[in-house]
UniProtKB/Swiss-Prot annotation:
Membrane protein topology class: Multi-pass membrane protein
Family: Belongs to the glycosyltransferase 4 family. MraY subfamily.
Biological source species: Novosphingobium aromaticivorans (strain ATCC 700278 / DSM 12444 / CCUG 56034 / CIP 105152 / NBRC 16084 / F199)
TM region(s), chain numbering: 27-47, 73-93, 97-117, 138-158, 162-182, 193-213, 230-250, 256-276, 282-302, 331-351
The protein's name in its UniProt record: Phospho-N-acetylmuramoyl-pentapeptide-transferase
Pathway note: Cell wall biogenesis; peptidoglycan biosynthesis
Gene Ontology biological process terms, A to Z: cell division; cell wall organization; peptidoglycan biosynthetic process; regulation of cell shape
InterPro entries in the cross-refs: Glycosyl_transferase_4, PNAcMuramoyl-5peptid_Trfase, PNAcMuramoyl-5peptid_Trfase_CS
Top EC category: transferase
Length: 354
């Protein structure tokens, strides 16, 4: 909004400054951070009063988690609010790619909110039926894919100019990437600070990737897909980082609030659509490797148990497996953060390695 206003009124100095995406990305990050820190305490108090018992805690989980009873959930409302307000100030509202990201963030956030609300009101672990939730996610993802997808070639990193033409099937692939990313982050969100920091790291990584993909000179030099307007995605990533850092302030152990499905689905879906829009879906699987590992651990656990009656892991998702092995919650979280940083560096290396 400020971007278009400055262009329309021809503000000297500020108009020149605001046209730089790097400046707007930094401003968006700081704005989202400040907004999140300001509204955070009020949101938490409101959620605590309205929810009473807070998020249901699994009885069959690690016994240390029982101390978290009474902690409110739906903290994702704070994240989405800070992210949205900062974007309205600094993004180019004419950008089709940013609107695709906004559709997924708000759409997935709403689905997550309904799921959280059902769990809190019934004080049960099962919220909205999985089939209903997934159907909603696929509808939202399909609309976002229609907005975000231009070329239908799948870019394969590391190999020089290797693209796999998928044609119309690319849209199906894009939808599965978006839905898969949303649910993978959702499965990761099981410990204080575990999901939000890897999301921040992934968003920071894709801010760099999106900016480079949006610049024809850099994209040509690096041999990566050039996506016109992709630089605006860096501003969206910056908003995710700022809002995420603000949430982490309150989610640091012992957490004062959980993001719930409201936040995890919104942020995961956003990462998915950003990767699709920037044509770096495979790189997302690398950068978000922690989320992939968490999701795969659940799939393997369920599949093997149904077939043999035996468990591969002591408990799934895999972060609970390490807790059952005797790792403290803080140890699991910090070590998983380190894994995320390493994976982000590997993801960035694919931009240059050929």
């Amino acid at each position: 909004m400020l971007y278009l206003l400055a262009q329309w009124l021809h503000f000297e100095g500020f108009s020149n400054l605001i046209r730089y995406q790097t400046f707007r990305a930094g401003a968006t990050l700081l704005t989202a951070l400040v907004i999140g820190l300001i509204i955070g305490p009020r949101f938490i108090n409101m959620l605590r009063v309205r929810q009473g018992k807070g998020q249901p805690i699994r009885e069959d989980g690690p016994q240390s988690h029982l101390a978290k009873r009474g902690t409110p959930t739906m903290g994702g409302l704070m994240i989405v609010t800070a992210l949205t307000l900062s974007l309205l100030l600094w993004m180019d509202v004419t950008s089709r790619l940013v609107w695709a990201c906004a559709v997924v963030t708000l759409g997935f956030g709403l689905i997550g909110f309904l799921d959280d609300y059902d769990k809190v009101t019934k004080y049960a672990h099962k919220g909205v039926p999985a089939k209903v939730r997934l159907a909603g996610e696929f509808v939202v993802a399909a609309f976002a894919a229609w907005l975000a997808v231009g070329e239908t070639n799948l870019y394969v990193p590391v190999f020089s100019n290797l693209y796999v033409p998928l044609g119309p099937f690319y849209y199906l692939f894009a939808i599965f990437v978006i839905v898969g990313a949303g649910n993978a982050v959702n499965l990761t969100d099981g410990l204080d600070g575990l999901a939000i920091m890897p999301v921040i790291i992934a968003a920071g990584t894709f801010a760099i990737i999106a900016y480079l993909a949006g610049r024809y000179d850099f994209a040509t030099y690096l041999g990566i897909p050039h996506v016109k307007g992709a630089g605006e995605l860096a501003i969206f990533c910056a908003a995710m980082m700022g809002a995420g850092l603000a949430f982490l302030w309150f989610n640091a152990p012992p957490a004062a609030v959980f993001m719930g499905d409201t936040g995890s689905l919104a942020l995961g879906g956003a990462l998915g659509v950003i990767a699709v829009a920037a044509h770096h879906e495979i790189v997302l699987a690398i950068v978000g490797g922690l989320f992939v590992m968490e999701a795969v651990s659940v799939i393997v656990q369920v599949a093997v148990y149904k077939r043999t009656g035996k468990r591969v892991f002591r408990m799934a998702p895999i972060h609970h497996h390490f807790e059952q092995l005797g790792w403290k919650e803080s140890t699991v979280v910090i070590r998983f953060w380190i894994v995320s940083i390493v994976l982000a560096l590997i993801g960035l290396a694919t931009l240059k390695v050929r």
